[in-house]
């Protein structure tokens, strides 16, 4: 990996391409000496902070307040909801010792925080006046994953978790709709990542939930990646933690609850993978740590100062207009090296300024997404950049949507399902609804999973199950996943 640029094609070897981009674009360092724990470098963290900001803004617009709960959760909290503990206990990291002394009770590093939040909700919620309660935290969580991949599956990963409580189930279901809309506003509208929100089958729902609704996107290798989810918890946790309220008639009732988890890590992975190309990252301007880079070009010492003077004026003008701009005046690198480096890092707009640009009052503008150049007059530069801000995002959305739709196929027969999964497609098919059939499909296709139905799907007669031939009552999506 000593070469400057990416040495493989994304379409031919996505796994190696992804590894090279993470390393060569300066996103992560995997040399930290604990497996599954990743060092996040500045370029990556600036992208992640922007994504966090988008979600936090949407959450707070819809009435959520930020909180921060302790990292550790006592074991007795976990034990309160049987299905939840059975689902998560195999992955939990336990703190059992402090200094040389063994702790009297084990403390879990949070794998998720229902059992921390709802312990406190039993104190905070007493009356109908305390509802709805809508809180979120932006944190790392910890799970002992066996097979790790940076930003996709790790033992420590970044996310947001929102935990909401309501007086009625109808309000909780409305919250799930709101969660899905918040996901759409950020993941699709701001980041250009297409996805399907699917209602997971009963055997694949979140541990302790009545229903799970999850957003799946399709990666370049055809595997799907769950990037966000929202869960109808019903009253299970309310009963386990005795979260009750007095209603307006003086009757004590259990609250209805939801939880929502945008996977910041995985959304970032999808952003990198879906928009990137064989030159490296391709970033929308709204998340790019540097939105505009200026590269001076001169070959004679006598031209240096007038070229740099123009570059400095452009830098000040662009910064004044509100953009993150960097003048790359490093003398130890050639302009060509700088071009490759900033393309690798995904900077959306590059300005090239040489003697000709100084003399003609123009700038050569390079668009990272299309890899095209055009001449723009100095006087029109800011309006041109403002237009590019939208144009680049719309182009990324167009390409991503085109790819996403091309990877979904319909099948009605077993061999069609097998062939589609072999070729990296997501399959839409009639399904009998039986877990045994889903298990057989997964085993026979080396990992093809029933991902679920569309959100408003109604059961009915849909002919024969494409896999087993039994009467089909559902139309489901099937794919291999990470």
Swiss-Prot record:
* Pfam families hit by this protein: HGTP_anticodon, ProRS-C_1, tRNA-synt_2b
Superkingdom of this protein's organism: Archaea
Protein name (record): Proline--tRNA ligase
Q: Which HAMAP family match?
A: Pro_tRNA_synth_type3 (MF_01571)
The family line of this record is: Belongs to the class-II aminoacyl-tRNA synthetase family. ProS type 3 subfamily.
Q: What class of enzyme is it?
A: ligase
What quaternary structure, including any partners, is listed in this protein's UniProt entry?
A: Homodimer.
Name the PANTHER family on file.
BIFUNCTIONAL GLUTAMATE_PROLINE--TRNA LIGASE (PTHR43382:SF2), PROLYL-TRNA SYNTHETASE (PTHR43382)
């Amino acid at each position: 990996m000593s070469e400057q640029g990416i040495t493989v094609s994304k379409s031919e070897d996505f796994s190696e391409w992804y590894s090279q981009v993470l390393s060569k674009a300066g996103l992560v360092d995997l040399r930290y000496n604990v497996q599954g724990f990743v060092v996040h470098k500045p370029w990556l963290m600036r992208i992640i902070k922007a994504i966090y900001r988008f979600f936090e803004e949407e959450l707070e617009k819809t009435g959520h307040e930020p909180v921060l709960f302790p990292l550790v959760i006592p074991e007795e909290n976990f034990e309160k909801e049987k299905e939840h503990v059975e689902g998560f206990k195999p992955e939990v990291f336990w703190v059992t010792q402090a200094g040389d002394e063994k702790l009297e009770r084990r403390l879990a590093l949070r794998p998720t925080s229902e059992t921390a939040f709802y312990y406190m909700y039993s104190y905070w919620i007493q009356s109908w006046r305390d509802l709805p309660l809508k809180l979120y935290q932006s944190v790392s969580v910890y799970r002992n994953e066996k097979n790790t991949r940076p930003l996709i599956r790790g033992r420590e990963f970044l996310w947001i978790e929102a935990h909401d409580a309501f007086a009625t189930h109808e309000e909780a279901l409305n919250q799930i709709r709101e969660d899905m809309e918040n996901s759409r506003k950020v993941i699709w509208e701001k980041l250009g990542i297409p996805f399907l929100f699917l209602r997971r089958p009963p055997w694949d729902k979140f541990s302790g939930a009545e229903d799970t609704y999850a957003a799946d996107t399709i990666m370049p290798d055809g595997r799907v990646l769950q990037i966000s989810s929202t869960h109808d918890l019903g009253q299970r946790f309310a009963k386990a933690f005795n979260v009750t309220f007095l209603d307006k008639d003086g009757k004590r009732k259990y609250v209805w609850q939801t939880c929502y988890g945008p996977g910041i890590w995985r959304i970032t992975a999808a952003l990198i993978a879906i928009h990137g190309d064989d030159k490296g990252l391709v970033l929308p301007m709204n998340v790019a740590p540097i939105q505009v880079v200026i590269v001076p070009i001169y070959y004679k010492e006598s031209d240096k100062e007038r070229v740099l003077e123009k570059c400095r004026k452009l830098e000040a003008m662009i910064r004044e207009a509100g953009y993150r701009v960097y003048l790359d005046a490093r003398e130890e690198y050639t302009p060509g090296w700088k071009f490759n480096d900033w393309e690798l890092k995904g900077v959306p707009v590059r300005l090239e300024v040489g003697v000709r640009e100084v003399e003609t009052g123009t700038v050569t503008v390079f668009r990272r997404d299309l890899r095209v150049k055009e001449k723009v007059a100095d006087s029109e530069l800011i309006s041109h950049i403002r237009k590019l801000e939208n144009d680049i995002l719309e182009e990324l959305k167009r390409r991503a949507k085109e790819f996403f739709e091309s990877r979904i196929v319909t099948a009605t027969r077993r061999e069609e399902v097998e062939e589609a999964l072999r070729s990296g497609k997501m399959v839409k098919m009639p399904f009998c609804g039986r877990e045994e059939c889903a298990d057989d499909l997964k085993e026979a296709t080396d990992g093809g999973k029933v991902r679920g139905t569309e959100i408003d799907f109604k059961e009915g007669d849909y002919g024969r199950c494409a896999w087993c031939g039994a009467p089909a009552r559902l139309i489901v999506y099937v794919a291999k996943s990470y």
